Amino acid sequence: MAKKSLVVKSERPAKFSTQTYTRCERCGRPHSVYRKFHLCRICLRELAHEGQIPGMKKASW
């Protein structure tokens, strides 16, 4: 889990548009966040395995 202070800091409006960065909406993780889902790779994987994300399934080839 991300530090509460950093999550609150990321929610504040940035002074400049280049200072914004993505955080996972579920856990607050700042790295490897998918823009389409607003989730980090770990949360995305967990929700996909639970069937919470429609149309997403585990790939096998």
Curated annotation (Swiss-Prot):
Assembly with partners or alone: Part of the 30S ribosomal subunit. Contacts proteins S3 and S10.
Pfam families linked to this entry: Ribosomal_S14
Source organism per UniProt: Pediococcus pentosaceus (strain ATCC 25745 / CCUG 21536 / LMG 10740 / 183-1w)
Stretches that traverse the bilayer: none
GO cellular component, one term: small ribosomal subunit
Binding residues annotated for Zn(2+), in chain numbering: 24, 27, 40, 43
Cofactor(s) demanded: Zn(2+)
Signal sequence interval, chain numbering: none
Stated family: Belongs to the universal ribosomal protein uS14 family. Zinc-binding uS14 subfamily.
Name of the protein this chain belongs to: Small ribosomal subunit protein uS14B
GO biological process: translation
Cofactor: binding details: Binds 1 zinc ion per subunit.
InterPro entries, A to Z: Ribosomal_uS14 (IPR001209), Ribosomal_uS14_bact (IPR023053), Ribosomal_uS14_CS (IPR018271), Ribosomal_uS14_sf (IPR043140)
Gene Ontology MF, one: zinc ion binding
Function statement: Binds 16S rRNA, required for the assembly of 30S particles and may also be responsible for determining the conformation of the 16S rRNA at the A site.
Chain coiled-coil ranges: none
Top-rank lineage group of the source organism: Bacteria
Key words, A-Z: Metal-binding, Ribonucleoprotein, Ribosomal protein, RNA-binding, rRNA-binding, Zinc
